[in-house]
């Protein structure tokens, strides 16, 4: 796990922010949010979120304690100030005493705390960020952490790796319930530098943007090192000869995927073929069905990744037979997907 912090870049972001009327806190929050979001080992498909607690003027010009948190729909790798809506912090902290609230009421409450009523919706995990006392908080769905946090004995493994430096929280649906569970766990161990949320991801925090970011990179790196130490062997790639070429397979696949719209028009798809040594190595595994069967590594990725893929094979000769089998496989996939 490479630490991409640069003092030079940090100063540049501060200077840009000053010209745009942004505080140093917000400028550095933008900078580290972006370098987190640009690393696919940490964040995929717009997942994760970040926050900073700071002081900003409200509509009347009065200095107000706020939390700027990633807004829904914003990609961390392209975040701008508008993607970090500011909310009054004190009204959010008052919710620590309210044990239950559904998502609709919670979002209405959060919108009522926005400094700018026209701002985007704040993250569903805003209250988790608000309930914790730390100035800068980072949250990612790091691949290496999830590879461990999804194991049957995940907490035991995590304690072996991290000792007492991190807290460990069982999976809870993001939103109001998770915010309260995380708050209670932190309250029992306020010395920790972050949290592993089982089947979900990792939080780190700090008094500065760099401290929170450094901790994220360090703890994800420790997970990577642990996995490397346990790796027995790579998947073996089985060379195959005589398969139908991509040029012959693609039209058959497009035909099978085509469908009729409600207004009677034919809907066809443009295919995007992707391959690499890593992809071919993975697809050559004898355990491919098992490896692709358990769904995404965290429920937070299901919106973009979807729960499972359709696996099919290409025959070496008769594509007409494969086309019939593909149609059967697609029908079964659609029924499973819609169940």
Predicted regions and their residues:
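Glycine-rich flexible loops
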Residues: 1-339
